UniProtKB/Swiss-Prot annotation:
Organism annotation: Carboxydothermus hydrogenoformans (strain ATCC BAA-161 / DSM 6008 / Z-2901)
Pfam families hit by this protein: RBFA
Function field: One of several proteins that assist in the late maturation steps of the functional core of the 30S ribosomal subunit. Associates with free 30S ribosomal subunits (but not with 30S subunits that are part of 70S ribosomes or polysomes). Required for efficient processing of 16S rRNA. May interact with the 5'-terminal helix region of 16S rRNA.
Entry GO MF terms: ribosomal small subunit binding
Protein name: Ribosome-binding factor A
Subunit note: Monomer. Binds 30S ribosomal subunits, but not 50S ribosomal subunits or 70S ribosomes.
Keywords tagged on the record: Cytoplasm, Ribosome biogenesis
Lineage: Bacteria, Bacillati, Bacillota, Clostridia, Thermoanaerobacterales
GO biological process entries: maturation of SSU-rRNA
Localisation: Cytoplasm
Signal peptide location: none
Length: 125
């Protein structure tokens, strides 16, 4: 029974992720909202809270403005979510910055730098 409950929990989190992504991209009309993507949703066991991980492409100012826009549209997003995903209790939404894409980009920069250094060292030898 535990595996079934876990699977249902994952499906619910995925449904929330897809719905929130669609709402943000198509319904939220705030000019402060930059290029954002929903990367992950962590759902509390009792479905009372949903941490929505957001990746924002752009400068620190773009990130700040995007999170301000998301937090001001939180009520609207929750209402739209309630009409799209049928849950007995609609979770409280929390938008959290997901640094994983930036982290991955930084790793790629480091690897490219190492690759260039290795190429320069081979040409000097």
């Amino acid at each position: 029974m535990r595996v079934l409950a876990s699977h249902k929990h994952e499906r619910t989190a995925q449904a929330i992720k897809e719905a929130v992504a669609a709402i943000i991209s198509r319904e939220v009309k705030d000019p402060r909202l930059g290029f954002v993507s929903v990367t992950k949703v962590d759902l509390a066991r009792d479905l009372s809270q949903a941490k929505i991980y957001i990746s924002v492409y752009g400068s620190e100012e773009d990130k700040k403005n995007s999170f301000i826009a998301l937090n001001s549209a939180k009520g609207f997003i929750k209402g739209e979510l309630a009409s799209r995903v049928r849950l007995r209790i609609m979770p409280e939404l929390y938008f959290v910055e997901d640094p994983s894409i930036e982290y991955g980009a930084r790793i790629m920069e480091i690897l490219e730098g190492l690759k260039k250094e290795a190429g320069e060292n081979e040409s000097e030898s």
